[in-house]
């Protein structure tokens, strides 16, 4: 069963279902349920329970139409869902980009690389290689999105009310990974695998 509603089913601050979602699930007991929700203007996927998932969909137009991306760095994009024989798969699709673009480099220096996974959830894995040598898993990290921070601090120019709202959303999110180069300016290859086994690759070239 797919349930589409504006209000989120899950309270991400308390890690609990909202009361109205509990009532819905009592009525749908025994079924696989996917909630597709909005309101938060953020992208996240919550595995609430076995066979119960919430897809919290980021706003396609950015943060309340005032920023070119959502506070978690999600750019203009849509959630695409494919159904085959009763089974769902999904991923975010950046507007004007291939569906294969799921990794974005947000920091790239001589000694460190930080990436954002657009449609990330806890079932993704991310590995990296340096100059062709496998270096294992990247370190996941929480951080304020660098692109959103730059926009708010350097480009946004609205009234005090709007600016206050934009600044309040400068909070940490979990869908970032970082690595430390062992050799300055080395060539880095990053491979991310989503919950469906699809692989995505991006490179940070030698400088």
Question: Residue spans of the language-model regions?
Answer:
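Short, surface-exposed loop motifs enriched in S/T, G, D/E and P with embedded aromatic residues
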Residues: 131-146
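Binuclear metal-dependent phosphoesterase catalytic core
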Residues: 52-131, 165-166, 172-205
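Beta-sandwich/jellyroll recognition modules and their flexible linkers
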Residues: 141, 204-207
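Flexible, glycine-rich phosphate/dinucleotide-binding loops
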Residues: 10, 63, 135
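Aromatic sugar-binding surface patches on proteins
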Residues: 145-180
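His/acidic metal-ligating clusters that form di-metal
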Residues: 1-56, 77, 118
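Residue-level detector of flexible, active-site-proximal loop/helix-junction positions
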Residues: 42, 61, 142
